[in-house]
From Swiss-Prot:
Keywords: Cytoplasm. Pfam families: DUF896 (PF05979). One of its GO terms (cellular component) is cytoplasm. Belongs to the UPF0291 family. It is found in: Cytoplasm. It comes from the Bacteria. Its main location: cytoplasm. It comes from Exiguobacterium sp. (strain ATCC BAA-1283 / AT1b). Residues 63-77 have a biased composition (Basic and acidic residues). Residues 53-77 are annotated as: Disordered. This is UPF0291 protein EAT1b_0405. The keyword Phosphoprotein does not apply. HAMAP family: UPF0291 (MF_01103).
Amino acid sequence: MLAPGQLERINFLANKAKTEGLSQDEMNEQQNLRQEYLKAFRQSFKSQMMGMKVVDPDGNDVTPEKLKEDQKRYRGE
């Protein structure tokens, strides 16, 4: 999870880069913030996928076997 204000800082640096450019320190900060954001996004996405179940219109579980296996590993079963 990103700390409060990090997303705003990412957006601020992106806008500044477009309008006036960034110093080397700001470019490094932007890169680090983007990496943290991607890590948090991927972790959140994986958590959502590991809780997902696919059901057809008849109510049958049609979750792909690969996903079921990954879910079992994720839960430690």
